[in-house]
Amino acid sequence: MNSAPLSTPAPVTLPVRSIPGSYGLPLVGPIADRLDYFWFQKPENFFTKRMEKHKSTVFRTNVPPCFPFFGSVNPNVVAVLDVKSFSHLFDMEIVEKANVLVGDFMPSVVYTGDMRVCAYLDTSEPKHAQIKNFSQDILKRGSKTWVPTLLKELDTMFTTFEADLSKSNTASLLPALQKFLFNFFSLTILGADPSVSPEIANSGYIFLDSWLAIQLAPTVSIGVLQPLEEILVHSFAYPFFLVKGNYEKLVQFVKNEAKEVLSRAQTEFQLTEQEAIHNLLFILGFNAFGGFSIFLPTLLGNLGDEKNADMQEKLRKEVRDKVGVNPENLSFESVKEMELVQSFVYETLRLSPPVPSQYARARKDFKLSSHDSVYEIKKGELLCGYQPLVMKDPKVFDEPEKFVLERFTKEKGKELLNYLFWSNGPQTGRPTESNKQCAAKDMVTLTASLIVAYIFQKYDSVSFSSGSLTSVKKAS
């Protein structure tokens, strides 16, 4: 999909420049870059230092994983770190997305039923359109019960938080939050109730956590003391048998309890039962549960930061002016009228995108433009964009390092949505079978807005610190 105006041909006035940087010596270069990425510099500093060194937002480097036990993985990438160059990742005429969800490394298909699920398919593959249309149909049908289900599950979660606060000074966020997410998305995406199985109800979210962690371990930092993390986590791919039993329990849960959705997948979208089951689990586990498990703690952390007391007051006022304190007034339509609440959600996604790195492979030779230069990209080269840096492009965003509540309000704010790319495309874009933009792009931002509105209907103020809820003041 073209993300105009950024994907328009480069102006002829821009100079053509060879791509700076190098991949270093064989074996040595990739390992040195891997150690910088995970250990000595960390990802954002890794890209920042190279951007400063080369005086360019486009350069060659290596990204993990790599040698010694990833011999089939090519770590060579062309980094694209400004808004203009990054936007080429969404132009499906010049790039393709087969098997590059997390770079040249792809977790074994045994994690997904011995098949490539939709996230690993290119738009040119017929199966992509079938599964993308199926996922959009799921969301459309789920939207009918989305809001009441969300409010019910939020009531349960915040009752747990309040009970924990009554016993101690803090309520740990992640366990209750992930249980909430698992229940909510099982009900709305699968049409399946986890409570029918005590094991799934109590441990389903843990099964998903371990399934995700084992697959993605070579590509993410988990905070283990170095060099143990490099030796034990980033040096090899973990075998599926470690999570096989629990994954098969999730497969059985979907097969038994999501029969209506599975039937529709087969009759209306010509998918096999196995294709539907494993794609549903990937949508549930990676896209919905995994994405929100990263996004919501950040959203709540921004909301509950003591430094943002003034921001809470503004958000609370907007929520109560629009919908009062009655949860029955909350709807997709009502939160669309909350300009500040939506801007708060967008600004969180700008500074902390749930999926920080995005990749695409050149479908053909083409000319890639940054703000100040044009570069020749060869067919087959892998492009890598690190969003936390891209979204701080000073040529697009004023005060890019600062959290600005009102950034996405009024006409200028609406224009900036063209350059908000957290969803694998611009916020103003439309997910279709011909692009790779997140099918739930709008549902994510509306759901987050509903959660913020719910909180300020229920509470005058909230405080979060170090992954815990530390205080609440109920609505007066």
From Swiss-Prot:
UniProt-listed Enzyme Commission number(s): 4.2.99.-
Membrane topology type: Single-pass membrane protein
CC annotations in GO: chloroplast outer membrane
InterPro entries for the chain: Cyt_P450, Cyt_P450_E_grp-IV, Cyt_P450_sf
SS bonds (residue pairs): none
Ranges annotated as spanning the membrane: 280-300
Gene3D superfamilies: Cytochrome P450 (1.10.630.10)
Gene Ontology molecular function, alphabetical: heme binding; iron ion binding; lyase activity; monooxygenase activity; oxidoreductase activity, acting on paired donors, with incorporation or reduction of molecular oxygen
Alphabetized UniProt keyword annotations: Chloroplast, Fatty acid biosynthesis, Fatty acid metabolism, Heme, Iron, Lipid biosynthesis, Lipid metabolism, Lyase, Membrane, Metal-binding, Oxylipin biosynthesis, Plant defense, Plastid, Plastid outer membrane, Transmembrane, Transmembrane helix
Keyword Chloroplast on entry: yes
Main location: plastid
Family statement drawn from the similarity comment of this UniProt entry: Belongs to the cytochrome P450 family.
Protein name, UniProt field: Fatty acid hydroperoxide lyase, chloroplastic
